[in-house]
Amino acid sequence: MGQKVHPHGIRLGIVKPWNSTWFANTQDFADNLDGDFKVRQFLNKELANASVSRITIERPAKSIRVTIHTARPGIVIGKKGEDVEKLRNAVAAIAGVPAQINIAEVKKPELDAKLVAGSIASQLERRVMFRRAMKKAVQNAMRLGAKGIKVEVSGRLGGAEIARSEWYREGRVPLHTLRADIDYNTSEAHTTYGVIGVKVWIFKGEILGGMAAIAQQPEQQPATPKKAPRGKGRK
């Protein structure tokens, strides 16, 4: 009882696109799938501090095209594009085919579930009170135009002997409405008391017209290589 289906999985092909877009023969499918997993694993490890939201992979004509959605494109690109060139070579070695890497900037990280969950987890690791971290995330999301947001944390909250769950919600989060644009993600905070799980649901509004309406929306422009300013950037 009380189990929830994954908000992205139930909406795939309705209002949510796939993170990997390619077709393969039966004998190549497993290799491509394993390659996608290894590429994402490598990029998430290398770009742990770059606020990466999601990684989309396409495989056109015996090559691989990776799009990294990040709130801090300057860190990914590096000085004069040096870092992104290293990533391109590494991805090509992992996938075994020529690689192309595009960088897409996340304009509003406060409305991205993965970045919000990661921010809350990092605050918990820095011993910020969990209620303060949750409330701040909710207020920022609502201020920037979210229709609703729910945040849940589970574990030994505040160092308590018995683990428990607490959640905070503001606005609407209609999980059963398939046309609702629900962004969902999780993160983990590794504290001295143990692991605290963080879940975030963000309702951004309803999408009428399904995938056709999403395809007509203007895509985010790839970020141009430029040097990241010192002492600035989102943490």
UniProtKB/Swiss-Prot annotation:
Instruction: List all disulphide bridges recorded for this chain.
Output: none
Q: Which GO terms describe its molecular function?
A: mRNA binding; rRNA binding; structural constituent of ribosome
Q: Which UniProt keywords are given for this protein, alphabetically ordered?
A: Ribonucleoprotein, Ribosomal protein, RNA-binding, rRNA-binding
InterPro entries linked to this entry? KH_dom, KH_dom-like_a/b, KH_dom_type_2, KH_sf_prok-type, Ribosomal_S3_C_sf, Ribosomal_uS3_bac-typ, Ribosomal_uS3_C, Ribosomal_uS3_CS
GO terms classed as biological process = translation
Q: Which stretches make up the KH type-2 domain?
A: 39-107
Record field: compositional bias (Low complexity):
215-226
In the UniProt record, the signal sequence range is none
| GO CC annotations, alphabetized | cytosolic small ribosomal subunit
- Which Pfam families does the annotation name? KH_2 (PF07650), Ribosomal_S3_C (PF00189)
Q: Where is this region: Disordered?
A: 215-235
Classification via HAMAP family: Ribosomal_uS3_B
Role of this protein? Binds the lower part of the 30S subunit head. Binds mRNA in the 70S ribosome, positioning it for translation.
Regarding protein family, the annotation reads: Belongs to the universal ribosomal protein uS3 family.
Subunit structure, as described in the record: Part of the 30S ribosomal subunit. Forms a tight complex with proteins S10 and S14.
Q: Which NCBIfam families match?
A: rpsC_bact
**Record protein name field:** Small ribosomal subunit protein uS3
